[in-house]
């Protein structure tokens, strides 16, 4: 049984930065460090940080006065940010992915101008909640759509003054269909100057398409609440392949790979490489041969951690 590895796969720059922020805060200030929401959507990462003293919470009022708080990579609304700044916290660090912040700025700009904004995204996802929460102009409006059918039912105030943006971890193909529906219904709608779906999401989806050409089965390493990991599994399924989203090697069922000639392995943007290596080891135990790395798009983007975690401590304003 051949093992093929998608390339690129695993950690993106935003995830790497977010995890580094929590790790460095723990090193510099010691436990406990409070983090609003899971810093990234991966069970292994969250459990590892929890063991080191990170405490993951959902509401700001769960954080004691004098504590250190970190916002997750998914970003937060203006209301949550204001609530945190009003608290007597020692330090506040923002691990929001810079590419999510880019979308936040697009929404905030639309809000200032009074332009109605339509976000393409998944309801209930923390990134979507944070992005929607950047709009606060009652004269305008902020709307969420997930699929083309939502566009047909959407009622806006002014069809001539509309813009749209997207969640960063969506399916490129599905999002294109929704954008086509928006442009058909609202011909004057304006989109972002640069695609909101991030480079890592796009690259990993492109890589899984390549992987699915040769693999009979595709294993996607990623947690169930990881948006980008779910999209990878869906893409492989659409290619007609058996696809499974797994948290770890322990989830692999022997029946999935029995009699299979080629297994493809990829990982979502929040899944660490150690999990991929454990999956390869398990597949080898089930009859796999040495894993072959496919040729893919090179990624060399790095997002720096806040300067306070590089140089000196700065008190929260």
Curated annotation (Swiss-Prot):
Which domain of life does the protein's organism represent? Bacteria
Q: Where does dimethylallyl diphosphate bind?
A: 41, 74, 125, 226-228, 270
- The UniProt record lists the EC number as 1.17.7.4
Please list the residues that bind [4Fe-4S] cluster.
12, 97, 198
Question: Where is isopentenyl diphosphate annotated to bind?
Answer: 41, 74, 125, 226-228, 270
**Catalytic center at which residues?**
127
Which residues does (2E)-4-hydroxy-3-methylbut-2-enyl diphosphate bind?
41, 74, 125, 168, 226-228, 270
Q: List the pathway annotation.
A: Isoprenoid biosynthesis; dimethylallyl diphosphate biosynthesis; dimethylallyl diphosphate from (2E)-4-hydroxy-3-methylbutenyl diphosphate: step 1/1; Isoprenoid biosynthesis; isopentenyl diphosphate biosynthesis via DXP pathway; isopentenyl diphosphate from 1-deoxy-D-xylulose 5-phosphate: step 6/6
Spell out the reaction equation it catalyses. isopentenyl diphosphate + 2 oxidized [2Fe-2S]-[ferredoxin] + H2O = (2E)-4-hydroxy-3-methylbut-2-enyl diphosphate + 2 reduced [2Fe-2S]-[ferredoxin] + 2 H(+); dimethylallyl diphosphate + 2 oxidized [2Fe-2S]-[ferredoxin] + H2O = (2E)-4-hydroxy-3-methylbut-2-enyl diphosphate + 2 reduced [2Fe-2S]-[ferredoxin] + 2 H(+)
Write down the InterPro entries for this protein, in alphabetical order.
Answer: LytB/IspH (IPR003451)
Keyword RNA-binding (UniProt)? no
CDD domains attached here?
lytB_ispH
Tell me if Protein biosynthesis is a UniProt keyword of this record.
Answer: no
Picking any one GO biological process from the record gives: terpenoid biosynthetic process
As cofactor, the record names: [4Fe-4S] cluster
The note on the cofactor says:
Binds 1 [4Fe-4S] cluster per subunit.
Q: Which keywords fit this entry according to its UniProt record?
A: 4Fe-4S, Iron, Iron-sulfur, Isoprene biosynthesis, Metal-binding, Oxidoreductase
Q: Name one GO molecular function term.
A: metal ion binding
Q: What enzyme category does the UniProt record give? A: oxidoreductase
> What family does this chain come from, according to its entry?
Belongs to the IspH family.
Q: What does this protein do?
A: Catalyzes the conversion of 1-hydroxy-2-methyl-2-(E)-butenyl 4-diphosphate (HMBPP) into a mixture of isopentenyl diphosphate (IPP) and dimethylallyl diphosphate (DMAPP). Acts in the terminal step of the DOXP/MEP pathway for isoprenoid precursor biosynthesis.
Assembly behavior: Homodimer.
Q: What is this protein called?
A: 4-hydroxy-3-methylbut-2-enyl diphosphate reductase
Task: Please name the source species.
Answer: Erwinia tasmaniensis (strain DSM 17950 / CFBP 7177 / CIP 109463 / NCPPB 4357 / Et1/99)
